[in-house]
């Protein structure tokens, strides 16, 4: 059984290990540390199985800058699961739980730069469908948006901006 809960201070080392092992490099783990250090408005969840942290997902503030106005929402990045626990629904539970919490917090959207074959099952669509593009050069099918509040997002198009820690 998978338990999804908010990260706790005792989880920091395990979260770092999950990100390093899942991505095979330090970049994502370092990003998590920088965001945690510089940003108070994060949603950081862990997946626990057999009393072990086996997955992690982080949502951080993002914005979409339109000609008319700027809308504040959240970005999903990174999401990681230990290799030996992949293909067991851990990532899906992390994403679903995170989205539910962001809806509760009234976030109007979530953006993700990720696998085009994975994230649509949660309702993500290419952001280009909404006239929204990333601040970086990325494939249209990999940059996706999940609208959580239609009324807040009505008429919004433009550039999605991540926090400076991402650059």
Model-inferred region functions:
Residues 32-36, 131-133:
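Short, solvent-exposed loop/turn elements at beta->coil junctions and helix N-caps
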Residues 63-75, 86:
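A conserved beta-turn-beta hairpin within the catalytic core of GNAT-like acetyltransferases
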Residues 42, 141-144:
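Short hydrophobic/aromatic beta-strand or adjacent loop that forms the aromatic wall/cage
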Residues 60, 94-98, 126-130:
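Short acidic (Asp/Glu) patches
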Residues 104-108, 113-138:
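Conserved active-site alpha-helix within GNAT-family acetyltransferase domains
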Residues 1-31, 38-54, 75, 150-167:
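Short amphipathic alpha-helix that is part of the acyltransferase structural core
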Residues 76, 81, 87-100, 112:
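Conserved acetyl-CoA-binding loop-helix of GNAT-fold acetyltransferases
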């Amino acid at each position: 059984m998978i338990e999804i809960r908010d990260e706790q201070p005792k989880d920091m080392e395990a979260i770092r290990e999950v990100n390093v092992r899942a991505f095979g490099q330090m970049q994502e783990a370092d990003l998590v540390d920088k965001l945690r250090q510089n940003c108070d408005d994060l949603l950081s969840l862990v997946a626990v199985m057999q009393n072990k942290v086996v997955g992690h997902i982080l949502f951080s503030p993002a914005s979409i800058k339109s000609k008319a106005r700027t809308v504040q929402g959240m970005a999903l990045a990174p999401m990681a699961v230990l290799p030996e626990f992949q293909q067991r629904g851990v990532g899906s539970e992390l994403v679903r739980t995170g989205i539910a919490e962001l809806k509760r917090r009234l976030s109007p959207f979530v953006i993700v730069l990720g696998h085009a074959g994975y994230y649509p099952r949660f309702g993500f669509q290419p952001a280009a469908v909404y006239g929204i593009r990333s601040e970086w050069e990325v494939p249209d099918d990999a940059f996706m948006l999940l609208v959580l509040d239609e009324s807040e997002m009505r008429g919004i198009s433009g550039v999605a901006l991540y926090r400076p820690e991402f650059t």
